Amino acid sequence: MRKIIAFLTIVIFASYAYGEFSLIKLGIDNNNTVLVTGGIQGDEPGGFMSANLLARGYEITSGSLYVVPNLNMPSIIKKSRGINGDMNRKFDTLSDKDPEKDIVEQIKSLVLQPNITMLINLHDGSGFYRPKYINKMMNPNRWGNIAIIDQATLPNAIYGDLEATANKVVKELNKHLLDPKHKYHLRNTHTAKGDKEMLKSLSYFAIKNGKAAYANEASKTLPVHERVYYHLIAVEEYLKLAGIGFKRKFELTPQGVKKALDEDLSVLVCGKFMFYSPKSRLGYIPLSNDGELEFDCDNALVALTKNKDEYNIHYGNKIVTRFTPEFFEYSNLINEIEIRIDEREPKFVILGQKISAKNSFEIIKRDGVRTNIIGYGTTPVDESGIKISKDMIKSRFSMDKDESIYRVEFYEETDSKDKFIGMILVEFVK
């Protein structure tokens, strides 16, 4: 789980042993681990959305895969190539005063782990690369739809025949083109011969340290789901060439990718909170009053930022919803509640779940716990023991755009201000 802690306007991203990005490990660790990264440049959603879908939509059946979808999350949030300069130009020499010094060192240490044998960086590039000039969008100065290597071979490295490997990937990509103009090419930057910019890149840092490294670029002229489609075809071929087995949870077509991305965006689970296709603006959300805001999110591209008196929930470089907080002391008094759905026998439900009802629901009374059905009443009284139908709740208090999902919150009753325990969502279905 990825923890996001916000102090006023400062947002700190943390996961595992790394302080600035999420490292997601799939499969079983071994000495042949492929590392896939996205988001080193925050204005390339095809790259970071692909890495995130790889982490969330694949099962590794043999071998080991590491995924970092959000190498530069602050820049992703701002839709910026780099809020502190281009991070992908900071892997040669870097001043100790650079604000990204620590994260760059963390990325370097990850790449240098002995088990990492291949690095794949996912990027979005302009236009469509062509070896010879065709027009302003298809020429040698464009970076879209290419596989990039720094040199043809890397002696003594596993997968050191960089050119041969990348050519196999290009060949596979070109079997699945959506349009002939999307044709992929191999681009060798011959970095060691004097490409001053590429000498500073993450890929070349890996090369200098004996690790096979590749970059895949998808054209920025394509919609994001088509970029992701091409990126994942490339990643799958690299994984096959590295002997990594996998199962995919969606169909690898533009439509299948778009559906998977939309589903991933529609359900955000963050600790005590759930957001299902949330409205662009929500009412009061109970947050901790201890001076620290904690969100334990299961999605590496979800972030929380504060803007004056509101909070924004980001998914990648989109703001999914905004909400106004109401501050409470938190309580862990219970972790489940009893509920009757559609007049059937009551059942226990773990907090943090979404349940469905056709006609009605009723929260069973529990001593010391106050139930608050958002949109039903106007005063802070216990609303358990009441059979609630959809027409009894004001639709403007719904969580979702379809006005079918409603919050039910639970509080520990105290002599002063009640403490927030948690919530469930109730969806009225037809």
Regions inferred by a protein language model and the residue ranges of each:
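Structured catalytic-domain cores with a bias toward divalent-metal coordination
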Residues: 2-6, 16-430
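Hydrophobic core
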Residues: 9-13
